Amino acid sequence: MSQFVFTSESVTEGHPDKICDQISDAVLDALLTQDPHSRVACEAVVNTGLCLITGEVTSTAEVDFINLVRSVIKEIGYKDAQAGGFDANSCAVLVALDKQSPDIAKGVDTAEDHTDDPFDKIGAGDQGIMFGYACNETPELMPLPISLAHRLARQLAKIRHQGTLKYLLPDGKTQVSVIYENNEPIAIDTIVISTQHTSEIDDLSSEADIRERITKDLWEYVVKPATSDLKLQPNQEKTRFLVNPTGKFVVGGPQGDAGLTGRKIIVDTYGGYARHGGGAFSGKDPTKVDRSAAYAARFVAKSIVAAKLAKRVEVQLSYAIGVANPVSILVEAYGSGKMSNQELTKVVKKHFDLRPGAIIEQFNLKNLPSKRSGRFYRDTAAYGHFGRPDLNLPWEKVDEKAKELIALHN
């Protein structure tokens, strides 16, 4: 019998790094909505009273970037200086966007050694490695720790937007530690929530009283509703519940910490339960395999688990710039598969087209923003890119592919 504790974290949409991810993806959405062939690599930086967007864009779209940035910040909840120390109306917004390098554009536009197949003509936008993962711990086939951390972060933001707890401010983080026995989750060991709040709550002003009040409220309005439908429930007597462990969290958001696009890549994926290739997602158009191939790798892994060919699977893909076909494909099932890793890898090579052009076409990645009223990627930029039944993500829809695999290999 082997037992261990695994921990994952999430952050709310008001976290400085997540503000930047959402801004970068809002820019991407706006450009792709007007011009689906836009090439975008947009980074954002926020600090006290400042937002900078920079990077490379080649597009025929015309976008009011300054007003777009302000609208994102405002929707998150930074509507005035009292709402977390960052004001959408008065912060400086700087724009420094260049065009995509012609050397990179050439690699995408004309793949090396391409055939008459149109998908062979589109090369990867960069070299790199990407990982996808799935397991049978949750209905959405995600690891339980990151799934729970996202649930708590979403619920925390939800009650703030609804005004349930009027003292809540936009910045926040959640963390969940799960006890495993023989690789199966058996209990929730610890929950940590750090949430920004006003300096006073009702008639309370002492740090101890405020912390006690927040702790009681968050268990009632965040933890309980976020976990009510789970088989594995937190226990108020056995589960450690830590809230704002330093005592208070008044100064937060960009006033408390600078934020950058792409600094929450583990939050965006599997909470550390699987490996990560290092490439961030937000602000990148679908020709960037950091994003599109990571989505495809998740689709492959989830399809395998949904077909019950394995209980948990990690898929590694690698690419070279300007080359359409993956350089390598590797499947690791950790001994949980109905066949060997080598056989599973053969299944993937036979049944999944992992060329960038095919991935873009299968998931309609260039057209999703225009199909969804100008907003798609921005909604993936907070609370995870995977295991999101609320967003109707094409790389999460594996039923048909799973049926195909079941018919062929069961």
From Swiss-Prot:
K(+) binds at residue 43. Pfam families: S-AdoMet_synt_C, S-AdoMet_synt_M, S-AdoMet_synt_N. L-methionine binds at residues 56, 100, 257, 288. One of its GO terms (biological process) is one-carbon metabolic process. The keyword Cytoplasm applies. Residues 100-110 are annotated as: Flexible loop. Mg(2+) binds at residue 17. This is S-adenosylmethionine synthase.
